[in-house]
């Protein structure tokens, strides 16, 4: 199903010609290749996972994630293309064993992908007219969102809850109370979790031109299902977060690293310190490799 869906999405937007591997050079010259690069180390993978995580205080705070049913919706795109993007986002969520609404078009979207002429102007106008919608954002996040001048803006609303799902009110300073405790398996858990209530991913239409529906859906998935950010520094592993990099060739879809990152975020219970999730990307990559090789998964 996933392979067929990926093919349909790729066919619905610009395609890129590729040379066939192994085809001899036209002039018959001998091609000399160097030694393959060594695979990235566990430390490099963890460093990359940390760099794309849009959050500080990872040793004390959990990473935000969806705990309620997910309902993706698209604004500003033709219905048939929007349907393909929604199918892809839902398929990505299914791979993470996320809780999804029925795919009948009747749910109220809590994951909105919108294509607009000027995302910064849209948000500024919305703040002027309905500023109360931004009250749940800490002041520094609100300022960063409204000042963002890149091709994509991500507006994530979260709710701090106890580990059992009871809402926790923020203090006067905007920071939720935190607590640590010992639980089973000799792991340290935190007393609260951070639930994503809703996400709006705004693409500037001019910058989205030339990208495939598959790339756009996977980029939105990577930015919306977790609080991530693109980085300008060179990375050890490819990522769909490089989709709008001015230099280089972005991947055609989510990479193994991307899937491992999201799998780590949605692995186990939600009230685990973020640093544990970040370090878990290495484990998820190993599990992926074992699955591709047909080897039985080993307990770690």
Can you annotate each of these PLM segments?
Residues 12-14:
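N-terminal signal peptide c-region/cleavage motif recognized by signal peptidases
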Residues 27-38:
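N-terminal secretion/transport leader regions
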Residues 73-88, 97-300:
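Long, folded non-catalytic interaction modules
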Residues 39-66:
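Compositionally biased P/S/T/G-rich terminal and signal peptide-adjacent segments
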